[in-house]
Amino acid sequence: MDTSLGARLAESIGVHGPMPFDDWVEACLYDPDGGFYASGGGAGRRNDFLTSPEVGPLFGAVLARWMDSRWEVLGRPEGFTVIEVAAGIGTLARSVVAAGPACLAGGRYVMVERSASSRDEQPTGGCLSSVPDLSVLVGEGPVDHGVVLANELLDNLAFGLLEVIDGRWHQVVIDGPHGVSGEFRMVPGEATEPPVPVDAGSRPSGTRIPVQTAAAAWVAEAIGLVGAGSVLVVDYTSTTPEMADRPSGQWLRTYRGHERGGEPTEVPGSQDVTVEVAVDQLPPGAVADTQAAFLRRYGIDNLVEAGRRLWEERAHLGDLEAIRARSRVTEAKALLDPTGLGGFTVLEWVCS
């Protein structure tokens, strides 16, 4: 009996009919027995895509400065809590803790990660702890003072798709395997309204937009969790009208082994499925900036200069400290690149 994810999805569609696109993405990414992340996919040099924390420890060192700045604004409270969602194997947590932010001297750093295999690789001890879902912390009640942060999470939350057909928006759903190839297909579903005003009548049939209900709900939940502090997300972003004006293949992307993957319907669970984050579908009130500007505001240039001086002092030794110092220069280039990671958007909601 075929128990693969594809076979199970085909069986479900055969019984219940075409599947909403967001349910399809959820299964392809997070099914515990065949989803992309449960099967070992993820960020890192040996995996499928590279995020800012995997570039090196410099990103975490700058975020540690941001955390301290928020702690200072709140009056240096005891018990300051840092919550990192989609923490993976703890790469960012390691870098932040290694930087030694003052806010964690009497505080805690909680990694939230739904993948059990990733949690098994996370660092432990000291101020660090781990939970499988943000709801665990929500159940404990509001965090008096702290921050919630997520790097490239929202683009990986399940999202729906709408498509213009004869001047109206329709849901996009997934139908079961058909024909000799046995491929899943995206087909039109029921007519519906878009999440924000985007005129379908003025756009050609086939125009698509994402519906990012889960991303909006996540931000709202994170804001509600923090009594005083901030919610910070880093991601590649756009707006719903902007995406309506572009081919969907430009903003709905798949990745496998550091390269672009195939169609989102191709071999369920074999590739990452991502979407640009529509900021106009998120809760209002965020302060937005580019990653490059954010990192400069919190001292990346000073850290790089300090690393350059340390390298000059210790280059003749060639020890690990000297090599790490030299690495800051190349890390900064990647993190600040306006055509790459530096062009990502940083959104911060201040909670009080």
Task: Give the label of every model feature segment.
Residues 1-144, 293, 299-302, 307, ...:
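Rossmann-like AdoMet
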Residues 83, 112, 148-151, 234:
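Active-site flanking residues adjacent to catalytic metal/cofactor-binding acidic residues
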Residues 87, 116, 154, 238, ...:
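Short, glycine/acidic-enriched loop or turn micro-motifs at the edges of active sites
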Residues 120, 157-159, 241-242:
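Short helix/loop capping segments that flank catalytic or ligand/cofactor-binding pockets
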Residues 134-138, 154-169, 211-221:
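A short, conserved alpha-helix within the catalytic core of class I
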Residues 145-146, 229:
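Conserved acidic residues
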Residues 147-200, 248-256:
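A mobile, often basic/glycine-rich helix-loop segment
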Residues 194-352:
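Long, Lys/Arg- and hydrophobic-enriched amphipathic alpha-helices
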